[in-house]
Swiss-Prot record:
This is Putative NBPF family member NBPF7. The gene is NBPF7P. Residues 230-243, 403-421 have a biased composition (Polar residues). Encoded by one of the numerous copies of NBPF genes clustered in the p36, p12 and q21 region of the chromosome 1. It comes from Homo sapiens (Human). Residues 194-217, 312-333 have a biased composition (Basic and acidic residues). Residues 179-251, 312-334, 402-421 are annotated as: Disordered.
Amino acid sequence: MCLRFFSPVPGSTSSATNVTMVVSAGPWSSEKAEMNILEINEKLRPQLAENKQQFRNMKQKFLVTQMAGFLANQQNKYKYEECKDLIKSMLREELQFKEEKLAEQLKQAEELRQYKVLVHSQERELIQLREKLREGRDASHSLNQHLQALLTPDKHDNSQGQDFREQLAEGCRLARHLVHKLSPENDTDEDENDKTKELDKVQESPAPREEQKAEEKEVPEDSLEECAITYSNSHGPSDSNPPHKNIKITSEEDKVNSILVVDSESSQDEWQDALNILLENQNDDEEEEGKAPVPPQVTLWICGLKLQESEEKEVLQDSPEERVTTSCSDHDVSQSYQPCEGTFLALVEQKVCSAQDVASEHSNSKGEETPLGFPDTKYCWKDEKDERMSQKVAFLLDEKNYNSKPSSIPNTTLQGSFTED
């Protein structure tokens, strides 16, 4: 058996060798040789792969070294060291700009979120305000209707005091409800407190009225007499009252106004006491002068004034304008007398018949004949005092036509029947 080994071929990068085997033996030797070749090939393949990887690494290192050399040459060429600070500052500013831009974007996003929350809150407030305006509109409509009903005169109702207070309390409640609905704070506790205070005020309202009654009862008796004189002067004719229409008004105006607002119940007793005092004073004065006492027609006439005064007071409570026209006696009597003319004349006509009967009884008790007719709108009395009283009753009957035909009765006649010293 002859074996020949050949050296590697020049220029080849592989470390494998070509083996030529000359086998002169049989088939068994050829198979063994093939097995050896395969084993050698299997052993050399990993070495070949490793050598290829080393070659690639060497090539990469060469490229890196070549690039480093190129950069070094460029740095030396363009003086990189001098521009190094400038490049760093530019990079720093660029980074800062990016950070500021990012922070601004975040801030804008936060502001946008806050604006959205504010818009939603304002939308809710707008809805609440619309609801409040709607409720306030309803409350104002109710208050308007209540005030219209309050200002509408009711001629059928004579007990205006308590109803007027209740209507005022209702008006106050509606006004407070309106203010409460339109106010920014809408708490249920405040509403309950307002209702409690309102109920307390309504319950406490009769107390000041009772105190006012007590104070008016303490007014001296002479002020009642002056009130009667002032009232008779205020209803006198326009031609005869200028000489003395301001005698008692300027000095006793407050007292007269306090008398005019007395309750109907208390005014009845007070007027009765005042009439008794006036009659007693007049009878005493006439007894001292030696004259006959005052006939009872004066009592009837003053009772008519009393009833007219009580009804006029109720009208004054409903209408402040009528209080002004009846209390201010320095104005024209023909204008101020119109609101209560019908009521006063009706009362006078009712009392004239009873005055005739009482006059006849009074004259019959004295044994004198007294005609009860009304010739020339005057009574026929025995003495001068009775004639003056008849003139006063006749003046009341002629008061219907005082605007067109003023009465000629002097003021001294009217004043003398009440203010005889």
